[in-house]
Amino acid sequence: MATFKDACYHYKKLNKLNSLVLKLGANDEWRPAPVTKYKGWCLDCCQYTNLTYCRGCALYHVCQWCSQYNRCFLDEEPHLLRMRTFKDVVTKEDIEGLLTMYETLFPINEKLVNKFINSVKQRKCRNEYLLEWYNHLLMPITLQALTINLEDNVYYMFGYYDCMEHENQTPFQFVNLLEKYDKLLLDDRNFHRMSHLPVILQQEYALRYFSKSRFLSKGKKRLSRSDFSDNLMEDRHSPTSLMQVVRNCISIHIDDCEWNKACTLIVDARNYISIMNSSYTEHYSVSQRCKLFTKYKFGIVSKLVKPNYIFSSHESCALNVHNCKWCQINNHYKVWEDFRLRKIYNNVMDFIRALVKSNVNVGHCSSQESVYKYVPDLFLICKTEKWSEAVEMLFNYLEPVNVNGTEYVLLDYEVNWEVRGLVMQNMDGKVPRILNMNDTKKILSAMIFDWFDTRYMRETPMTTSTTNQLRTLNKRNELIDEYDLELSDVE
């Protein structure tokens, strides 16, 4: 069992405060929680194991045994995980509060050590100091933490994590915050704790302390779509489905600016127990709208593009072409269940075809053209440089004419009514016969921004907001979209 989990198991028997704070799921209890193949460290009990999704943020950071408590590091309730979670900027004073909490919950003194030794020796053949019997006394106090960057906030989940060398399949990365504190002071704390242990255990304690307090921080990982579970969605088959979030709260709401002060509540045991007795849960339905999910969807669309359509003469829109091996697209992919992506794909391809037909003498959709390789990138609006380069290459392929230092292309081929409306909306109420580079970029981006305006999107889904932020957005009625009514961003 993990050292931190062992310590919680044994120390929770000390007093009423510890029994409330150090409650973790035991490994010998089977729980009907979905196990995933994601390997990493459970933020609740710090053990390395298979992780399942959190019902508070949709990230994979909880093991099957701890999932029964539904704790999230973004909760308002000051449970142990929340008290170990800090937000940047972390000050020396904040770390002092964390260390004081550790000393309060996991004390080591002569009386306590003798109590644990006598408890172990009551069992047969346990006169030796085997490490597995005294694992709970071998947890040093370190500033080892797992970190993650969510929106503009960096979170640090302090704890004692074993097996740091193992594969990490989560977006959380190990950092050492020893430089934010005094190295000698931390050494002194641990040497004092260690002095109460038998010599054999002192050696192991020292080895663990230095290995977990002198390591180099790893670089931060970038979040990806696969880091978030789909299990919180109301309807996994609906692309506009809301996500159900559950957060643990308390009656006395703590402001986010006091985030790092949560660990200091443990000092007043009576007050802390009173606060925990007022705990309750809040449920929120939030939109999955964010750049991370949008980038993922458009990445799939870009791989399914049939660029030959822009040279074709098919009367039907791009997604409805049949019996043409060059233009027919496989529309059975789940991504096409999103009506917004269907509209965008059809409109962008129709507009590009109008530009090509207006400026280039082409024959049939079976022709092989150099511009094909840039067409998929026209849907990668989140990758600004790549998207701009694709538009420029398309524009140059159309052989623009230079007029007074500005290059123009023609637009005199028929477009569908929806594209016509979008062009008029962005070109002062009319459909121009000639377009320059900026006009082309403006129209193509507008077709995507009409439904996915990435300029004003969050980077990550709202499930990564703090409980106070969710509460505020809910009061403003800003947690959900109107996409189910087929209303666009513009409307």
Curated annotation (Swiss-Prot):
Record keywords, A-Z:
Host cytoplasm, Host cytoskeleton, Host-virus interaction, Inhibition of host innate immune response by virus, Inhibition of host IRF3 by virus, Inhibition of host IRF7 by virus, Inhibition of host RLR pathway by virus, Interferon antiviral system evasion, Metal-binding, RNA-binding, Viral immunoevasion
Q: Where is this region: RNA-binding?
A: 1-81
Task: Name a single GO cellular component.
Answer: host cell cytoplasm
Q: Which InterPro entries match?
A: Rotavirus_NSP1
What's this protein's name?
A: Non-structural protein 1
Keyword Transmembrane annotated: no
Q: Where is this motif: pLxIS motif?
A: 485-488
Oligomeric state and interaction partners are given as:
Interacts (via C-terminus) with host IRF3; this interaction leads to IRF3 degradation. Interacts with host IRF7; this interaction leads to IRF7 degradation. Interacts with host CUL1 and CUL3.
Q: Please give the family membership noted in the entry.
A: Belongs to the rotavirus NSP1 family.
Region span, Zinc-binding domain: 42-79
Which GO BP terms, alphabetically? symbiont-mediated suppression of host cytoplasmic pattern recognition receptor signaling pathway via inhibition of IRF3 activity; symbiont-mediated suppression of host cytoplasmic pattern recognition receptor signaling pathway via inhibition of IRF7 activity
Its main subcellular localisation, reduced to a broad class, is host cell
Protein function? Plays a role in the inhibition of host innate immunity by inducing the degradation of key host factors required to activate interferon production such as IRF3, IRF5 or IRF7. Associates with components of cullin RING ligases (CRLs) including CUL1 or CUL3, which are essential multisubunit ubiquitination complexes, to modulate their activities.
Q: Provide the residue span(s) of the region labelled Interaction with host IRF3.
A: 320-491
User: Where found?
Assistant: Host cytoplasm, Host cytoskeleton
Source domain of life is: Viruses
Gene Ontology molecular-function annotations: metal ion binding; RNA binding
Chain intervals for the UniProt region annotation (Important for cytoskeleton localization): 82-176
Query: How does the entry describe the domains?
Result: The integrity of the zinc-binding domain in NSP1 is important for degradation of host IRF3. The pLxIS motif targets host IRF3 for degradation; however phosphorylation of NSP1 pLxIS motif is not required for its activity.
